Amino acid sequence: MSTRELVVLGTASQAPTRTRNHNGYVLRWDDEVILFDPGEGSQRQLLYSSVTATDLTRICVTHFHGDHCLGLPGTIQRLSLDRVPHPVAVHFPAGGADYFTRLRYASSFHETAELAVMPIDTDGQQIAVRNGTLEARRLRHPIETYGYRLVEPDGCRMLPERLSAHGIAGPAVGELLRVGHLDVNGRRVTRAEVSAPRPGQRFAFVMDTGLCDAVYALAEHADLLVIESTFLASETALAAEVGHLTAAQAARVATESGVRRLVLTHFSQRYPDLSRFAAEAREHFTGDLVIAEELMTVGIPPRRVPSAG
């Protein structure tokens, strides 16, 4: 059975704390296992999680500030150490290619893993992945930064009562689904007549950024939104100055974008009590709210089921 879930490796921002590792997030999306923003210590955090290096199929880096990329050397070397048999795609801002090369070859090692290096050089760039499309959008931060959005294509679900009414059963259902129409007793029945739309699932990953149109574009109708909330509202001016969000801002984005499950993360070390983030976000968001914790697993909500009409 396919699995779609987020595994949190770390939740700290610029500086880790005794209880918070640098950033690191793994998205299980069926056969795709994507590591986002491996900060310092990510390789060790993987050992404590349900994810192994050999599971990884793709790495996505939003930008080259240390808390989002210093785990790359260890992770990349681990891919070779464990002799990962499949290519691992790597995406990052094209303007940071030199940083990536330095991190990739930060020390001597026997490289056996195959990396498919695919930099992001265009706002809105799309990459075909298994069971979806990965899109990158340029965010507002002091250095080149991209957020990522993974979208499953919309589909349809067959309605048993309508199939039965037309006398369609067995292999004929598969033919109708595949071809789009079926001739039954001298009448052509279309797939639309016996099915209802099934919206694809949507996942969004928004790290270091000030408010901008791209934040909303990434978050739009996301089933699961993972978004930075470095500061509380008392530091709104500072957040804007350094290109970050507050918990209140992240929560409002989620509400205005129709997000179903909101995961707040990337907390400043100045805040030992994360319950304040939950309280602030709850003032603006009534959906499913998660305050990320190390080694937490967060499921992607089931697909939306619209009315059959």
From Swiss-Prot:
Cofactor binding note from Swiss-Prot or TrEMBL: Binds 2 Zn(2+) ions.
GO molecular function terms attached to this record: 3'-tRNA processing endoribonuclease activity; zinc ion binding
Protein residues bound to Zn(2+) 2: 67-68, 208, 266
Catalytic-site annotation from UniProt: 67 (proton acceptor)
CDD domains given in the database record: RNaseZ_ZiPD-like_MBL-fold (cd07717)
Top-level EC class as recorded in UniProt: hydrolase
One Pfam family hit: Lactamase_B_2
Binding site for Zn(2+) 1: 63, 65, 141, 208
Gene3D superfamilies recorded: Ribonuclease Z/Hydroxyacylglutathione hydrolase-like
InterPro entries xref list: Metallo-B-lactamas, RibonucZ/Hydroxyglut_hydro, RNase_Z/BN
Keyword Coiled coil in annotation: no
Catalytic activity: Endonucleolytic cleavage of RNA, removing extra 3' nucleotides from tRNA precursor, generating 3' termini of tRNAs. A 3'-hydroxy group is left at the tRNA terminus and a 5'-phosphoryl group is left at the trailer molecule
Sorted UniProt keywords: Endonuclease, Hydrolase, Metal-binding, Nuclease, tRNA processing, Zinc
Tagged with keyword tRNA processing: yes
Cofactor requirement: Zn(2+)
E.C. number: 3.1.26.11
Subunit organization: Homodimer.
Family: Belongs to the RNase Z family.
Purpose: Zinc phosphodiesterase, which displays some tRNA 3'-processing endonuclease activity. Probably involved in tRNA maturation, by removing a 3'-trailer from precursor tRNA.
Protein's name in the database: Ribonuclease Z
Species, as recorded: Salinispora arenicola (strain CNS-205)
